[in-house]
Amino acid sequence: MTKPADIRVKSADELGALLIDLRKEQFNLRFQQATGQLEKTGRAVQVRRDIARVKTILAERQRAAAPKA
């Protein structure tokens, strides 16, 4: 599980790479679940939430960088 504080210190490039890695892991976990090979079912939930955390922090940074109307 990745903590939000750990995610916030990373650069945008690092967050992008982390997001790609998490999505690949999520794909593999879904494939394992479909074939009945998934042992740690809770990991799928953790990965989904980590993806949401990364996307939330990226969105916060985009809103902060956007010019005020």
From Swiss-Prot:
GO BP: any one term: translation
Organism: Granulibacter bethesdensis (strain ATCC BAA-1260 / CGDNIH1)
Membership in a protein family: Belongs to the universal ribosomal protein uL29 family.
CDD domains attached to this UniProt entry: Ribosomal_L29_HIP
Keyword RNA-binding set for record: no
Cross-referenced InterPro entries: Ribosomal_protein_uL29, Ribosomal_uL29, Ribosomal_uL29_sf
Keyword tags: Ribonucleoprotein, Ribosomal protein
Single GO term (MF): structural constituent of ribosome
Gene Ontology cellular component annotations, sorted alphabetically: cytosolic large ribosomal subunit
Pfam families on file: Ribosomal_L29
SUPFAM superfamilies according to UniProt: Ribosomal protein L29 (L29p)
Name of the gene: rpmC
Protein name from the UniProt record: Large ribosomal subunit protein uL29
